[in-house]
From Swiss-Prot:
Cofactor note: Binds 3 Mg(2+) ions per subunit.
Positions with a binding annotation for Mg(2+) 1: E71, E100
Protein name (record): Fructose-1,6-bisphosphatase, cytosolic
Molecular function GO terms recorded: fructose 1,6-bisphosphate 1-phosphatase activity; metal ion binding
InterPro entries: FBPase_C_dom, FBPase_class-1, FBPase_N, FBPtase, Fructose_bisphosphatase_AS
Enzymatic reactions: beta-D-fructose 1,6-bisphosphate + H2O = beta-D-fructose 6-phosphate + phosphate
GO cellular component, one term: cytosol
Organism lineage: Eukaryota, Viridiplantae, Streptophyta, Embryophyta, Tracheophyta
Binding locations of Mg(2+) 3: D121, D124, E283
Cofactor section: Mg(2+)
Its EC number(s): 3.1.3.11
Residues binding substrate, per UniProt: D124, G125, S126, S127, N215, Y247, Y267, K277
Length: 343
């Protein structure tokens, strides 16, 4: 019997154990973050289970309501939102929540308040539910200055002040990718154990990628730098092979592939959406945080995405994120345009 191999198989690094190990390095930590994260993980497990049996349980289809973004809500959207709000409030570690599905900020009852703010999209890519494409949950966590005196300004912090961010992708497997500010790690749900196990330690995005991810259906409305970049991806003039286009239409799935294989994900501003389409607090910031922690970059077309200071909870922004060199190319094209327009 191979005891060494057997020991390796049973020495599983769960997400809770991983976060506890990280927290033990901070002598001031009291375990609050671990408790909060365990409630987020529980919410992810619940939604993963609901997604797996959505067709059988008749959770697919419209719930007959429209959310704050003007999108008709899917039944699974509504359920996922309820699950995460209840999980986060019951943790006793949050004081304010921002959800993509709720028009207003949720301020937690003072008796149940903790020191964290969580901004989340409970079910990103929900328009893909019916056809079985990967969908996911995105979240970002901030520390609040004073839990007894919480205001909207506690929510409207720049992304660079984020404490942790992550997403959970519900696809062929259920994968949770997390950063607490010391790198990025990926965990896969083992259905037999009911635990997220570390399967992708210390994720690093390649410095340059071979893939670009964008909705080319919007091409006629793009500005010059975006059009030039995509043209260069398709018809490079330096003798290099063209980049491959991969676009799913679910941000979690597109960013996950970009993170693992390299390349760039683009959702630019255009004539139809001059402020971009993706929401700052619970889409742009968490994904930018993860990308930078993995060695990549994020850019809005004007500045580093994490330097943005939002003025409202459902604010939108253009976003370019991915491999360092690819985003650098996009930044150079925008700088070139700014220079020529000021000349």
């Amino acid at each position: 019997m191979d005891h060494a191999a057997d020991a390796h198989r049973t020495d599983l690094m769960t997400i809770t154990r991983h976060v506890l190990n990280e927290q033990s390095r901070n002598p001031e930590s009291r375990g609050d973050f671990t408790i909060l994260l365990s409630h987020i993980v529980l919410g992810c497990k619940f939604v993963a289970s609901a997604v797996n049996k959505a067709g059988l349980a008749q959770l697919i289809g419209l719930a007959g309501e429209t959310n704050v973004q003007g999108e008709e809500q899917k039944k699974l959207d509504v359920l996922s939102n309820e699950v995460f709000v209840k999980a986060l409030v019951s943790s006793g570690r949050t004081c304010v929540l921002v959800s993509e599905e709720d028009e207003e900020t949720t301020f937690v009852d003072p008796k149940l308040r903790g020191k964290y703010c969580v901004c989340f999209d409970p079910l990103d890519g929900s328009s893909n539910i019916d056809c079985g494409v990967s969908i996911g949950t995105i979240f970002g966590i901030y520390m609040i200055k004073d839990k007894d005196n919480v205001t909207l300004s506690d929510v409207l912090q720049p992304g660079k002040d984020m404490l942790a961010a992550g997403y959970c992708m519900y696809g062929s497997s259920c994968t949770l990718v997390l950063s607490t500010g010391t790198g990025v790690n990926g965990f896969t749900l083992d259905p037999s154990l009911g635990e997220f196990i570390l399967t992708h330690p210390d994720i690093k995005i390649p410095k340059k990628g071979k893939i670009y991810s964008v909705n080319e259906g919007n091409a006629k409305n793009w500005d010059v730098p975006v059009a030039k970049f995509v043209e260069k991806c398709k018809y490079p003039k330096d003798g290099s092979p063209p980049k491959s286009l991969r676009y799913i239409g679910s941000m979690v799935a597109d960013v996950h592939r970009t993170l693992l294989y390299g390349g760039v994900f683009l959702y630019p501003a255009d004539q139809k959406s001059p402020n971009g389409k993706l929401r700052v607090l619970y889409e742009v910031f968490p994904m930018s945080f993860l990308m930078e922690q993995a060695g990549g970059q994020s850019f809005t077309g004007k500045e580093r995405a994490l330097d943005l200071v939002p003025t409202k909870i459902h604010e939108r922004s253009p976003i370019f994120l991915g491999s360092y060199d690819d985003v650098e190319e996009i930044k150079a094209l925008y700088a070139e345009q700014a220079k020529s327009s000021s000349a």
